[in-house]
Amino acid sequence: MAVIKKGARRKDVKEPKKRSAKIKKATFDANKKKEVGVSDLTLLSKISDESINENLKKRFKNGIIYTYIGHVLISVNPFRDLGIYTNAVLESYKGKNRLEVPPHVFAIAESMYYNLKSYNENQCVIISGESGAGKTEAAKRIMQYIAAASNSHSESIGKIKDMVLATNPLLESFGCAKTLRNNNSSRHGKYLEIKFNSQFEPCAGNITNYLLEKQRVVSQIKNERNFHIFYQFTKGASDTYRQMFGVQMPEQYIYTAAAGCTTADTIDDVKDYEGTLEAMRTIGLVQEEQDQIFRMLAAILWIGNISFIENEEGNAQVGDTSVTDFVAYLLQVDASLLVKCLVERIMQTSHGMKRGSVYHVPLNPVQATAVRDALAKAIYNNLFDWIVDRVNVSLQAFPGADKSIGILDIYGFEIFEHNSFEQICINYVNEKLQQIFIQLTLKAEQETYEREKIKWTPIKYFDNKVVCDLIEAKNPPGILAAMNDSIATAHADSNAADQAFAQRLNLFNSNPYFELRANKFVIKHYAGDVTYDINGITDKNKDQLQKDLIELIGTTTNTFLSTIFPDDVDKDSKRRPPTAGDKIIKSANELVETLSKAEPSYIRTIKPNQTKSPNDYDDHQVLHQVKYLGLQENVRIRRAGFAYRQTFEKFVERFYLLSPDCSYAGDYTWDGDTLEAVKLILRDAMIPEKEFQLGVTSVFIKTPESLFALEDMRDKYWYNMAARIQRAWRRFLQRRIDAAIKIQRTIREKKGGNKYVKLRDYGTKLLAGKKERRSMSLLGYRAFMGDYLSCNESKTKGSYIRRQVGIKDKVVFSIKGECLHSKFGRSAQRLKKVFILTKKTFYIIGQTREQNAMKYTQDYKIDVGKIKQVSLTNLQDDWMGVILVNSTQPDPLINTPFKTELMTRLKKLNEKIMIKVGPTIEYHKQPNKLHTVRSKISDSAPKYGDIYKSSTIYVRRGHPANSKSNKKPKNPGGLSGKPIKSKKSKHKSTHKHTHSHRSHRDAAKKQPLPSQKPVNPLSLAATAAQAAYNPKPDKTVPIKSSAIPAAKVSSKHSSKPSSKEKVAVKKASSSHKSSSAKQNQVSMPPSKGVEKNKEPLKETTATANIPIPPPPPPMGQPKDPKFEAAYDFPGSGSSSELPLKKGDIVFISRDEPSGWSLAKLLDGSKEGWVPTAYMTPYKDTRNTVPVAATGAVNDVTNQKSSQIDNTISSAQEGVQFGSATVGPTSDNQSNPVGTFSDGLASALAARANKMRAESADDDDNDDGDDDDDW
């Protein structure tokens, strides 16, 4: 079912604004940015990495950072604030599909939230890209949009949204740091799930943490920084914290100052510290918990300041015990035990199943420093995990979670000069994300097409599964498994473990994506080749504290420290604890499983340069990212694939409302196969066949525009149904109102007459016998309506003129005309003017064209009370002089076809105005200078105009001055004059009845409607048709037995016509002349069918004695030629025009030099002006038939009517005018139908003569029902 269109409505029915289907006025949007490049890379004319890069560069240079590849968003980091995340921008994306608005991260968020509500499926967004490309910012903006879009007045819902938003500044402070590439680089990965209740309001959340970069706590590359929280804390700590925890500035700590960078551009550490505290309060961290968090941070910073020196024996010794004492105070452990754990390592030997000896092995300064750093990293890592768990506790406080939207913000691909274990883990996770992208977009899409037997051309792409297996595989072992084996073999010596690992790497030399070098190895990732250092890599993989450090923490009296280290040391356990590599593999696989359960969206971020400059665009660097992100392959598959796919069942469940065969009043009514239901939905929604394919179990829609059309139709379904009911009800009410108004108007006219006609008659009396009259002024439909320019209405030309001139009073008369403008030494000029009359003032308005627009100015503003006289000639011209009282202005001499009405209304408003009619018009051409204009009859003057030259008006002779206006013709259709046609609904009820509905509809079209009122038949053919249905004997004619017996006629043709029999007859238009001897041209409007209460012919004696009357004179040929419309002429809406359709046949009575012709319909019902160029002479190729017989009987639908038609034609052809007997030719005499026609024509001829004579005395003008403008 397509979108239901609203039918035409009456203009006088006021509708609510919100329901208006009116097209909004087009306006220029000055804020709209010019489109640069293409907004969707699938629209590129040439698909290549270079063309993609060039398009991204164009948009970046113009401040446009977002581009689509289908439903995948490409984001280029602008390194500046573009002002595109304001509330106003956010609101503009609500409820819009991605094609209605420019590409934006808000559009992806809106699509996710809409799909969550519409399909009740979990959603997730995978944000990928290298470090510094803008992944964290994109995640924040998605959270911002979802929180704003899911508006709720519930206090609990509002609180959970605040908590979700507060996780951003909190986790950024503890998990992000400044790097060489990015000032806010995520040094951990997180997957945030926002959970929604059944009303799709956020009610809970959960955060999963992935691989915090612990090494950054103790060391950073030069010009990089530690985690943000350390600089925030040291710069913004309160005096209380400084006294309790000995907080110093960041330059005083080794962990924050060693890299030589304690500040960063665009970062305000003190302000961010306040934001972190506010986030803690929002999430629900009490003050005691906050104190303990900052106590641990202070302990970590002071642990970094512990230094070691070498004693006489070459072993490590604490350089300053005051530092260790303060650390022991912060950790609430024994100071001597702390020092012992830092400079010694406990070694335990075993003999079989028995425990061996325990040795205290002293450490050298390098080893002691490593132990110190291990303790700091362990405390920070466990503190971060505790914060994430604590946030989850707060986010899970509200039950009712049903579905979720997941946001993955994880570290990007990294390639440094020296890459170690952290980089291999980070790059491995990015490989897994790339694998998901390939599986869910490229590979899965092509496999789906093959499985569903969809026509498809396979496209080659790089599947990085081989690289993932190289790192994570167990059998055969991958790189991380080989590293675990090396640690197990040489667990006591890190150097030995590194050498063992290097030897095991020889197993991978046959792998094309691996290369071994001296103390290094290379992995060929999808993003590029990365070289990793072997030295120290196995020690980082151990990810465990020495047992003596764990035992040290177990002795603390600080309950918070005990809480973040919950596991006790199992001294008897022989099982190898999981390494960092094991944990990251497990986390990555769990992440893949979680993402696979949700409907994914993708954001691919690109970093334009390494300098973090808003103006630089490194083509080489971006081109490299375009290649390893696989954007070209993505574009190719997107252009060849389908934008949407869904199983038949879910598609029908979603869109069954769009087909009337599948639904009724919102209920699903289809009981057939779901595949057939899908076909019905697509058919009724008018989706082209090229836009979709039907697979084995699913339907595939090619373009997103088709999907958006389906969604839009579904959204409007209930509105359309409600609008349909409202439309029907309003139509019923309006018909009732219209009927009441027509009854009231008719009653008022019967009692008191029509006020407009009364005003016309009053004006006629004012000029009675004084001024010749024009033809148009005599029409019965002419009435003094007044406001012909519709100045009192809104949105009309008249109202526009009224506003421009500044007229505020109600307008009683308005019309266009001309005014004589005199120039010194030159002939007077006729200028177009507009005349507007109010109750007090008469305005003459001039018009000029300026800058291709019409401008109206006030020429005269005349007080009606200051008009002394109105002067007119006694001929039929339209000139009129307005004589003013003691005016300093010249008297206006105006020309308007409605001069009589203007004069009448002026007289009504001011009874003192004198009306002077004579052969001349006298007016003041200049103040106190009387000028005379003569009038003269001239045959060379235009038929409907005049010529003004040298103060003389030349005009043709008009109708006599004492001519009276014709009576208003009666409407042929009762009150309204038009039948009320019932509108058939276009809505199909069911598929089963479609054919029957169509056949009924076609049959109805073949049935012509009867006219509303029978008319007097004046022609022989019309009389015969009328008599065939409803013959009546003429009581004034003596009856004789010489006529053909009517019993034969009655026996064959006296039955009543059925309701489906329709007959149209013609009537002759009456002449203005009273001569009854002249035969006039016959015009035939539609005649009403015979009424049911009419009696059929009866056999009577009187009928048998009807004499044969004398035959009428021969029918005259048509006076006016016939013309055929060659084109459609809808008209401009003026009542003087006659709208035509191509092929319509009319009479042309006269042609004007202006290019217009006066045309009349064949039935004489309407007359008006048509363009001469639109008309061509009509060539009648049918057999020659008398004009009166043409169209006498139309659209008969049964055999009986057909016989009547043949009878009439036979009667007309057989009449021998001027003879005593009337009958057909000899060939027809043997035909029984001919016998009927002979008698019928003879019997009705006399009746026709009498009626023709009576109609000649009737001087009513029934020419059309136009509102002629004279």
Curated annotation (Swiss-Prot):
Chain residues that bind ATP: 129-136
GO molecular function annotations of the record: actin filament binding; ATP binding; hydrolase activity; microfilament motor activity
Domain Myosin motor per the UniProt entry, residue ranges: 36-715
Mod. after translation: Phosphorylation of the TEDS site (Ser-357) is required for the polarization of the actin cytoskeleton and for ligand-induced, but not for constitutive internalization of STE2. Phosphorylation probably activates the myosin-I ATPase. Ser-357 is phosphorylated by CLA4 and STE20 in vitro.
Region spans: Actin-binding: 404-486
Residues modified to Phosphoserine: 357
Basic and acidic residues composition-biased segments: 1089-1098
Polar residues: bias regions: 1215-1234
Oligomeric form and interacting partners: Interacts (via myosin motor domain) with SHE4; this interaction is important for proper localization and may regulate the interaction of the motor domain with actin. Interacts (via SH3 domain) with VRP1; this interaction is required for localization to sites of polarized growth and may regulate the interaction of the tail domain with actin. Interacts (via SH3 domain) with PAN1; this interaction is important for late stages of endocytopsis. Interacts (via SH3 domain) with BBC1 and LAS17. Interacts (via C-terminal acidic tail) with ARC19 and ARC40; ARC19 and ARC40 are Arp2/3 complex subunits.
UniProt function note: One of two redundant type-I myosins implicated in the organization of the actin cytoskeleton. Required for proper actin cytoskeleton polarization and for the internalization step in endocytosis. At the cell cortex, assembles in patch-like structures together with proteins from the actin-polymerizing machinery and promotes actin assembly. Functions redundantly with LAS17 as actin nucleation-promoting factor (NPF) for the Arp2/3 complex. Motor domain phosphorylation by PAK kinases CLA4 and STE20 promotes CDC42-regulated actin assembly.
Domain notes: The myosin motor domain displays actin-stimulated ATPase activity and generates a mechanochemical force.
Name by which UniProt lists this protein: Myosin-3
Originating organism: Saccharomyces cerevisiae (strain YJM789)
Organismal lineage: Eukaryota, Fungi, Dikarya, Ascomycota, Saccharomycotina
